[in-house]
Amino acid sequence: MSEFRLTQISDTHLARRLSKLTDNFHRVSERIDATRPDLVVNSGDLAFDGPTHRDDLEFARTLHDALPAPCRYLPGNHDIGDNPTQVGPPPSQPVTEQNQQTYRDLRRRPLAF
């Protein structure tokens, strides 16, 4: 059986207007290029402010598409908003169906393998 190599990343918080975070992602991309995993999983917060800036999600998706390995995503609170809790204040960006649909639409774009 061959070895399956997985790289997990998270909290990239990407936005075109935040060059330092983009620079960080490029360093991560260089490491992924050097190690060539079979799959990359971003476990949330791809974008800096997906609920109010769809372009943040689109920018994040473009950078992830350029990775030298297939990539899958899980949504984080910076991507679709927060769920309310019983103990804390209400979220400033609650999860909405529209935010979830925007995220799903970006995920449905074909992935290159």
Where in this protein do the model-derived segments appear?
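N-terminal active-site segment of His-dependent metallophosphoesterases
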Residues: 1-58, 63
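Extended active-site neighborhood of metal-dependent phosphoesterases/phosphodiesterases
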Residues: 55-113
